[in-house]
């Protein structure tokens, strides 16, 4: 229902993204990077785009990355909302235990979102996971190529809009502009305001 709102751009600088560092009873660390969605004990996440599903409290959206030392344990808290869907992607490390289940290879795991889960890095190397969760939007979906709307009529209108204006016009003189070869970290916002950050900024800066 928010597909026709004004576009919005936010740069989430790595060093500004909040993190929770948890040391278990043995002193082994789990670091949770909070890209979106509140995590108990962590600083508040950065603001999502104002009309996104992540900005709606009922969306219960979370995007967290986990890095666990060998042997580390951390309890993933239950999601807030009933009906929230939750996926845990294990993609770096040797082995992971989720509750009573041992996972000996990289995998995508759908977890029951309404309960806590004890996670244990049972491998000999650091482990990394990505957690994605949210409430289903529960609206009709129509899709064609890169266009996603709610009805076929909206798909046709979006295609016509793109053919006519390329969604507002293409302001560059060619189809493949580049930003140059120098190493820079910058963001350019609507109105041409530009923000630049150090290439080696410390986390928390």
Regions found by a protein language model. Give the residues of each.
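Jelly-roll (double-stranded beta-helix
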Residues: 1-205
């Amino acid at each position: 229902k928010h597909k026709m709102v004004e576009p919005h751009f936010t740069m989430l600088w790595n060093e500004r993204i909040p993190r929770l560092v948890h040391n278990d009873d043995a002193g082994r660390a789990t670091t949770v990077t909070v890209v979106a969605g509140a995590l108990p004990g962590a600083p508040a996440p950065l603001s999502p785009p104002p009309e996104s599903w992540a900005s709606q409290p009922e969306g219960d959206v979370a995007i967290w990355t986990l890095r666990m030392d060998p042997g580390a344990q951390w309890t993933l808290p239950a999601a807030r909302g009933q009906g929230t869907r939750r996926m845990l992607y294990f993609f770096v490390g040797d082995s992971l235990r989720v509750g009573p289940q041992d996972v000996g290879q990289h995998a995508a795991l759908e977890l029951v979102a309404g309960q806590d889960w004890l996670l244990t890095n049972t491998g000999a190397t650091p482990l990394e996971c990505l957690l994605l969760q949210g409430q289903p939007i529960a609206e009709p979906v129509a899709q064609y190529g890169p266009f996603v709307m709610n009805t076929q009529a909206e798909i046709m209108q979006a295609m016509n809009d793109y053919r006519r204006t390329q969604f507002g016009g293409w302001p560059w003189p060619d189809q493949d502009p580049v930003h140059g070869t120098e190493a820079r970290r910058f963001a350019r916002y609507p109105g041409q305001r530009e923000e630049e950050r150090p290439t080696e900024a410390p986390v928390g800066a």
